[in-house]
A protein has these predicted regions:
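Short catalytic micro-motifs in class I SAM-dependent methyltransferases
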Residues: 117-118
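Helix-capping/helix-break motifs at membrane-protein junctions
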Residues: 123-124
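A short glycine-rich, Lys/Arg-flanked "PGG" loop and its adjoining helix->strand segment in the class I
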Residues: 128-140
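Class I (Rossmann-like) S-adenosyl-L-methionine-dependent methyltransferase catalytic domain
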Residues: 1-44, 53-102, 145-226
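Conserved beta-strand/loop positions that form the S-adenosyl-L-methionine
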Residues: 50
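A conserved beta-strand element that flanks and buttresses the S-adenosyl-L-methionine
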Residues: 114
Length: 226
């Protein structure tokens, strides 16, 4: 398990084309940021995507007027994001797989932080380091929206628990060939504990299933730094 970060980094070093913003991102914008808080991008709020991939979510927010920044461990994905948004190419950075709670991204002081399907690639210990890092990058009153794998996620059916919150997922189908480490959250109560640095506003979830492969349940946390 000691080299789990390298195993996961190898997984992300492959090509994963994801050009479109996901529904759980644009609905978060419309139903929470805009509806609840009147945040629509017109104020050019500073937004960080921790685990931005190829920048699909940031392209959506950039088009709305947000001042967007993204970090990821996958250099190939950061290169795609920079080529996709050359006007903010300097707003993307490759980071080390090992979280550093003292690291400040692009001067910090962010109004909004999102981290979708990223933090669940970390052990409990490294998750805590990453959350402290994000907390330190946010201003008082800023918002965070993040997801974690749910306990019912079908990947866990193909996994062995190895400690510190991590499950070693290994399986191969006609579509997938997985050898990686993931963290799964039992319920909303555990989700709240993991994000206890923030005041919780909404603890929720999203799920989908295709080809009858199984549930891909993820819990979501939306909260505020006080």
């Amino acid at each position: 398990m000691n080299d789990y970060l390298q195993t996961n980094a190898r997984y992300w070093s492959g090509t994963y084309n994801a050009p479109n913003v996901e529904s759980f991102i644009f609905r978060f914008y419309g139903r929470i940021l805009k509806f609840d808080y009147g945040i629509d991008g017109s104020g050019h709020e500073r937004l960080l995507d921790f685990g931005c991939g190829q920048g699909a979510a940031l392209a959506f927010f950039d088009n709305l007027g947000f001042d967007c920044f993204g970090v990821d461990i996958a250099a190939n994905d950061i290169a795609v994001a920079r080529s996709r948004m050359p006007h903010i190419a300097s707003h993307f950075a490759v980071i080390d797989p090992k979280p550093n709670p003292e690291q400040i991204f692009f001067g910090g002081n962010f109004d909004i932080v999102i981290s979708i399907q990223t933090l669940d690639f970390l052990s409990n210990t490294d998750f805590d380091l990453a959350i402290k890092c994000l907390y330190n990058n946010m201003k008082v009153g800023s918002k965070i929206y993040a997801s974690m794998n749910g306990w019912a996620h079908y990947y866990r059916n193909h996994a062995t628990y190895v400690g510190d919150g991590l499950w070693h997922v290994q399986f191969k189908t006609d579509r997938l060939d997985y050898d990686l480490y993931l963290n799964f959250v039992r319920d909303k109560e555990e989700m709240a504990k993991k994000f206890s640095l923030f005041r919780p506003v909404y603890l929720d979830y999203y799920d989908y299933s295709f080809r009858e492969e199984g549930s891909e349940l993820r819990y979501t946390f939306f909260g505020v730094k006080e």
